Curated annotation (Swiss-Prot):
PROSITE patterns noted in UniProt: SF4_HELICASE
SUPFAM superfamilies in UniProt: N-terminal domain of DnaB helicase, P-loop containing nucleoside triphosphate hydrolases
Name the record gives this protein: Probable replicative DNA helicase
Keyword Oxidoreductase: no
Primary role: A replicative DNA helicase, it participates in initiation and elongation during chromosome replication. Travels ahead of the DNA replisome, separating dsDNA into templates for DNA synthesis. A processive ATP-dependent 5'-3' DNA helicase it has DNA-dependent ATPase activity.
InterPro entries linked: AAA+_ATPase, DNA_heli_DnaB-like_N_sf, DNA_helicase_DnaB, DNA_helicase_DnaB-like_C, DNA_helicase_DnaB-like_N, DNA_helicase_N/primase_C, P-loop_NTPase
CDD domains recorded: DnaB_C
Single Gene Ontology MF annotation: DNA binding
Gene name for this UniProt entry: dnaB
EC annotation from Swiss-Prot or TrEMBL: 5.6.2.3
Domain SF4 helicase per the UniProt entry, residue ranges: 185-455
């Protein structure tokens, strides 16, 4: 039991603080049978949300194991707790066996989480009330400091309540109104700048939670273009970039990056045929690039689950991610669907990539090959239907960009001025116009530039 001594403001045990033992037990039980349940709890429940100490220890252990990509069931959890010397503190193996025997109904998981969250906020509110009473007796701290401290804690509690997936129209439109006021007061892009003026004008930048497909036939410059974009973003915003290179090694990608940034021919760079001026440029560029949060993963044949785990791990380490890049889509493996029908497998992959973009609130760029049918046409310029043999890319993508270099197919073109021109076709934009822009491509450095350079 708990009550307050009005003279001291101290808490005296008189009754239990709000909690729900069964809801906590069922939620923990769910975590032992479903990775989706862990993700749901990770978004909604802190360790302190659990009232019972042994429940907090179990939940903390599960989160640590999950972040390390350790399989989670009663055996692995028991082993982890034993190794940490925590098994006696949680009540022994019998507590874990009780959780396994609970047989939770996952359909109601979010409701059980809501109950736990509700009790946690109520406990926090009660404790804040006791703190307010105690603070009223303290005279060596200014009243202003006390009120500011209490206000901050109350604001934090309010945020706990509003941390929900369903928004009322009032909250939603109020949020949009604030965003619009900010944008109108400052001429900024709505999303991340690609570094290419005409592309930004059409798209208003890459938006959080967008799946962006950059497609083209081989040798159109997909990797170079995407690497240019990623470099532009990390240099401008200093946000972590995670680049999955499923085709090229990290060394090959690094050479391309250095060549494009230092404007040194990649063959000369690889051969080490560098003059003094080149070396000076190279040292300066390497120093600048080394200070940027640019992360490359060149693990081949990655599954969608592996990519998701690596994104989550980097987010946990860096606290934020600016952009995720996958080069390229057709080299990925499905986590669950093992089918001879590659189209179905690619459909599952693109849907999962869109889910990753939404879950982590980050733009995801995926490079994609186009159908070989392009080569059989007289006019080689790609169209949206060239993606349709690659699963549901067209349906799942928010933006579809296609690269076309006429020089590749018409090397004897008499119009020399057009030889370095690449068409960037914005074939789909879920929330904006489509169109075609022109870029300059310099094959000497595998780098793209604005067709008309902007100040």
């Amino acid at each position: 039991m708990e009550k307050i001594n009005l003279k001291t403001g101290r808490l005296i045990v008189e009754k239990y603080l709000p909690h729900n033992f069964l809801a906590e037990k069922i939620v923990l039980s769910s975590l032992l049978i479903s990775s989706e349940a862990i993700e749901t709890c990770l978004r909604s429940l802190t360790i302190d949300a659990f009232y019972f100490k042994n429940h907090r220890e179990i939940y903390k252990a599960i989160l640590i194991m999950y972040k390390k990509n350790t399989p989670i069931d009663i055996v692995t959890l028991n082993t982890f707790l034993q190794n940490q010397g925590l098994l006696p503190k949680i009540g022994g193996i019998k507590v874990l066996i009780e959780l396994v025997n609970q047989l939770p109904n996952l359909v109601y998981l979010e409701e059980y989480i809501r109950i736990i969250q509700d009790k946690y906020v109520r406990r926090s509110l009660i404790k804040l009330g006791y703190e307010a009473i105690n603070s009223g007796y303290i005279t060596n701290i200014s009243l202003e400091e006390i009120l500011i401290s209490l206000e901050k804690q109350m604001f934090s509690l309010t945020n706990e309540i509003k941390n929900q997936d369903v928004f009322s129209s009032v909250d939603l439109f109020s949020q949009i109104l604030l965003e619009l006021k900010y944008k109108s007061s400052k001429p900024v892009l709505a999303g991340l700048s690609s570094g290419f003026y005409d592309l930004d004008s059409l798209t208003q930048g890459f938006q959080k939670s967008d799946l962006i497909i950059i497609a083209g036939r081989p040798s159109m410059g997909k990797t170079a273009f995407c690497l240019n974009i990623a470099t532009n973003i990390v240099k401008k915003y200093k946000l972590p970039i995670l680049f999955f290179s499923l085709e090229m090694s990290k060394e090959q990608l690094a050479y391309r990056l250095l060549s494009a940034e230092a404007l040194i021919n990649p063959m000369r760079l690889r051969n080490g045929h560098l003059n003094k001026k080149d070396w000076l440029k190279l040292h300066r560029i390497i120093k600048n690039l080394s200070s940027l949060p640019f992360f490359i993963d060149d693990t081949p044949n990655l599954s969608i689950q592996a990519i998701r785990s690596k994104v989550k791990k980097l987010l946990f380490e860096q606290n934020t991610i600016g952009l995720v890049v996958i080069d390229y889509l057709q080299l990925m493996q499905s986590s669950t669907l093992k089918s001879s029908n590659r189209v179905q497998e690619l459909s599952q992959i693109t849907r999962s990539l869109k889910n990753i973009a939404r879950e982590f609130n980050v733009p995801v760029i995926a490079l994609s090959q186009l159908s070989r049918n392009v080569e059989n046409r007289i006019i080689k310029r790609p169209i949206l239907s060239d993606l349709r043999e690659s699963g549901s890319i067209e349906q799942d993508a928010d933006l579809v960009l296609m690269l076309y270099r006429d020089q590749y197919y018409n090397s004897n073109n008499e119009n020399d001025e057009q030889l370095d021109i690449t068409e960037l076709i914005l074939a789909k934009q879920r929330n904006g116009p489509i169109g075609t822009i022109q870029l300059k491509f310099d094959a000497n450095y595998t780098k793209f530039f604005d067709y008309i350079l902007k100040d």
